[in-house]
Every structure is written in C-alpha cells, then in structure tokens.
Amino acid sequence: MTDLHIPAMPIRVSEARGGDSLSGNLDDTVFNRLLKERIIFLGSEVTDQVANRICAQLLLLAAEDPDRDINLYINSPGGSVYSGMAIYDTMQYITNDVATIAMGMAASMGQLLLCAGAPGKRYALPHARIMMHQPSGGMGGTASDIAIQAEQMLYTKRMFQERVAFHTGQDSAQIEADSDRDRWFTAAEGLDYGFIDRVITGATQVPTGAGTRN
C-alpha cells in the first residue's frame, strides 16, 4: 500500500524476524555480495531507511561504472510515496540503465518502481503479481490543515498517475479509472498493460551488459 506517511521507528530486520544480530550480519553479507554483482534487492515496505539504502547503492554502482546495467529486484507491498519517489528519481538521475525484475509481489509504489525500469529491461517472474491503486493516507488537525493535506493528496495522486501513464503508454484517464481500487495483474497481464517488457523464467534472460541511455 502506498502511504503518505511512514512509521516513526522502522523495525529492524533481526527484530522483525525474532532473531539476533547474527541474522542481521548474514543479511548484510548476502546483500553486499549481491551488490558486487550490481544487484539491488527491494524486499520490504518502502520506508525512508530502505529508500536511503537503495539510493546510496544506486549512486555507488553508478560511480563505479556509469555504463553497466544495474539490476533492481522487487518484492514489495509498497510504502511511503516520498521515500519511493526518492528511489524513482535516483533511477532516472543516474546514466545507467536500471533493469527491474518483479518477484513475488510488486504492489503500489513497488509497481511504479517496476514500470520505471529502463525501456526493454522491465521483467517479471511467471508467478509475480503486480498491484496498482491510488495513494492513500490519513488526515487530521484543523479544517485548514485538512484542506492542505487534501490538496497535497490530490497532487500526489495526479503525479503518481502521470508517471505510471508515462511508463506504461496508457493514458492518464485510463490509469485513474484502473487505480480507483486495488487492481491486481498476473505477470502476463502486466506485460499486456505495459508494466513490464517480458516475462522471464531464468536469470540468463536478464542482460548484464552496458546501458543504452545517453
């Protein structure tokens, strides 16, 4: 779910799993090894902490080699719009092609990041599910505060729809209608809609060469 707010205190991986620091160290080892292969993994809700890590990894890999592709694997239920847009903007900012691969679930903000991958390099595994809906968030305070929050909500909704329309080739009116409520897509349906360019079954189907953007 794409929210306008995030929890004040994100739960650490080891705490969420009921483990100890050893599990956290193992996760770090795996993710660092993947990073050496130019693979970034988004496998959780999109929070400030997660977005800062992914943005830093994108910038690091771009600095190491501004031409080689970066592979972003996505298994996410969504999260904060603002945190997600930081990742989105960084993907567009660097010169590298960022290939996106959906596995499990790419929902809400995860869906936007999936379709924002480099043209021709947006993929999904056969049983991945893609979900699109409009941003949501709570409102409170005085009448003036609520009016300001409502205006911001409408701006965010329009921006989100315009970005999805741009990357899928659908028009904004169609995106608005289709995202009014949760809409789920299979990988094949996501291909037809324009979220992805190909349904893949093996890692060899994801190219690892130089990017094509100018």
What are these regions (language model features)?
Residues M1-M109, C115-N214:
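N-terminal organellar transit peptides
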